[in-house]
Amino acid sequence: MLANEDRFRIFTGNANPDLAREIAAYLGTTLGDAVINRFNNGEVQAMINESVRGKDVFIVQPTCGPNVNDNVMELLIMADAFKRASANHIIAVIPFYGYARQDRKARGREPITAS
């Protein structure tokens, strides 16, 4: 086990696991053991296969691409799983933030989704 793994762990969703692996290698650690599955109805299931109790957890999950909503839901469900697993801090690393273009109202009755 690497020394950094005692303090923090890096996990990834399905949006860009290659980027997460590169970040982990740069920081001298490995990716945490988690599996993100989909049920037949499309719902997301996150399974954390290691203890993160008391550790800082970084979730690398861009929210871009053809499945913006799916990527956001993966991130939220993973964050909830880590909270329930007693992680010390949960930090979302979002290299591209989907919905960022919706940062102001252009018309009436329109949401500001980026806030």
Model-derived segments and spans:
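PRPP-associated nucleotide enzymes
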Residues: 1-115
